[in-house]
Structure formats: C-alpha cells, structure tokens
Amino acid sequence: MSHGPKQPGAASAPASGKAPGQHGSFVVAVKQERGEGPRAGEKGSHEEEPVKKRGWPKGKKRKKILPNGPKAPVTGYVRFLNERREQIRTRHPDLPFPEITKMLGAEWSKLQPAEKQRYLDEAEREKQQYMKELRAYQQSEAYKMCAEKIQEKKIKKEDSSSGLMNTLLNGHKGGDCDGFSTFDVPIFTEEFLDQNKAREAELRRLRKMNVAFEEQNAVLQRHTQSMSSARERLEQELALEERRTLALQQQLQAVRQALTASFASLPVPGTGETPTLSTLDFYMARLHGAIERDPAQHEKLIVRIKEILAQVASEHL
C-alpha cells in the first residue's frame, strides 16, 4: 500500500522528465532542419557552379597585349582542338559548341601517348619560335614606345586611386596602348572562329589574286622585253635602209650628171635637142625613139651611145 502512491509519482516523474527531453530534442531537430536548409541550398549552388562557369569566365577577355607583335603560341591541346573541331562539326552539324568541346576533351584524354606527343612537340616548336620572334620584337622601337606608354599610365593609376576606382566602376580598362581595344577578342568562341575563317579565306583569296597578278606581270614583262628588242632591231634596220637609200640617191645623182655631161655632144636627130639634169629623161626617150625609127641610118650614133654608157657604168656603177 505504501508503494501505491509512489507509483503515480514515479510514473509522473519520468513522464515529466521525459517531456523536457523530447521538447529539447524537437528544438534541436528544428534547428538542424533550419541549419541544413541553407547547407542544402549551398550544395545546390555548388552543383550548379560548373554549369555557370563553362568556357572563359564572364567579364574576362584574353588580350593581345602586343600590337603588331608575334602571334602567341597555343598549347598542344588547343592545336588538337583546332584540328579536330571542323571534322566533328561536319560530322555533327547540329551539335552545340560546348558539346563539341566536351567530345574533343574526351577524345584527347583517350588519345595514344605517341599521337598526343606529336601535338605537344608541335606546340613546343611553335613556342620556341614565338620566344625568338618575341625577343626580336622587344628590341623594336614600336615595343619600346608602347612599354613607355603603359608605364606612364600605370604610374598615373597608382597616384590616383579614386580615378582607378571610377575607371573600374565605369567598365573602362586602363594600361593599354592607343588602339589596344581592337585586340581584346574573346578566343575559342563561335564568333572568333567564324571571324578567323573569314579572314583566312580572304587572305587565301588575296594571295591567289596576288600570284595571278604576278604571273600576268611576268608575262607582260616578257612581252615588253620582246617588243623592245623588236623595236630596236627595226630601228637599226631602218637606219641601215636610210643610209642605203641616201647612198643610192647620191649614186643616181652622180650617174645623171655624168649622162647629162656625156650626151651634151649628141643632139637628138631631127630636133637638135641636148639634155639637162631636169630634161634628161625626156631627152633619152626622144633619142631612143629616133634610133628605133631608122636604126640603119643611126649606126654611128648607136656606137657612140654604147661607148658613153660603158664609160659611165665603169666610173659610177
């Protein structure tokens, strides 16, 4: 009987003692749920992060710092991407650019070491060539002027922190030479690749036109040289013919003078006409006509004419 009253008290005591424990565990559970909520959200944000950070980070651009400088080399992996991208795009025209890059990355990881080394060796050779060209470029006046401008602007930025903050807030970029903004091009994007393709196609077209023009120019130069040689040859022949013509004219004039002097003592029968330089042709025609009409009568005249002609021929022909 004495234990009867204690049982309710004992029962109530554990009940009352258990209630605070349950309440406390409930509060802890609620706190844990509230604490786990943000952690789950944080985890979700971490899981979404790789999706947001595909490609080159937003707001960052690869810059071509050196105007007119040597082209920076690419890695062996990038050389592999450039070589295989068009093949994949031709085979899968509807595949987006990130998926193509993903496929190429998987293909690169499975590539045989010997084949992969080929791209790495080519990249190393290109890097050595770039370093050689870069050292030569750094000795040029253009690079020195550009470096001076960059240093001056850097000093101005350090002296004026407020100006730097305003520049950063306004989205301006400092420390570049004049005209550098044209070289801020994000690479490995569709626009960049398409622009490169268009420029390379234009360069190929211009090179082809240049070769065609050079060939035409060479042909025209050969024609010009041939025509010049022909003209010189014709000019020489013309000068020779002019000299011959002058000599013949002088010889003809001497023969006419000799004939006029020799036939001055032989008048035309029946008319008594004697020749002069201006009438020699008419005189010879009339003399020939008179002899033909009666050759027997003018035998002595014929003999004399033959003697005169033989003498003139021996002296002037």
UniProtKB/Swiss-Prot annotation:
Coiled coil segments of this chain: 190-257
Start and end residues of each stretch annotated as Disordered: 1-71
DNA-binding region: 70-138
InterPro entries named in the record: ChromReg_NeuronalGeneExpr (IPR051965), HMG_box_dom (IPR009071), HMG_box_dom_sf (IPR036910)
Cross-link Glycyl lysine isopeptide (Lys-Gly) (interchain with G-Cter in SUMO2) mapped to chain: K31
PROSITE patterns from the UniProt entry: HMG_BOX_2 (PS50118)
An annotated GO BP: chromatin organization
Record field: compositional bias (Low complexity): 1-22
Record's keyword terms, sorted: Cell cycle, Chromatin regulator, Chromosome, Coiled coil, DNA-binding, Isopeptide bond, Nucleus, Phosphoprotein, Transcription, Transcription regulation, Ubl conjugation
Positions of modified residues (Phosphoserine): S160
GO-annotated molecular function: DNA binding
Compartments, record wording: Nucleus; Chromosome
Record carries keyword Nucleus: yes
Chief site of localization: nucleus
Entry function: Required for correct progression through G2 phase of the cell cycle and entry into mitosis. Required for RCOR1/CoREST mediated repression of neuronal specific gene promoters.
Protein name: SWI/SNF-related matrix-associated actin-dependent regulator of chromatin subfamily E member 1-related
Organism this protein belongs to: Bos taurus (Bovine)
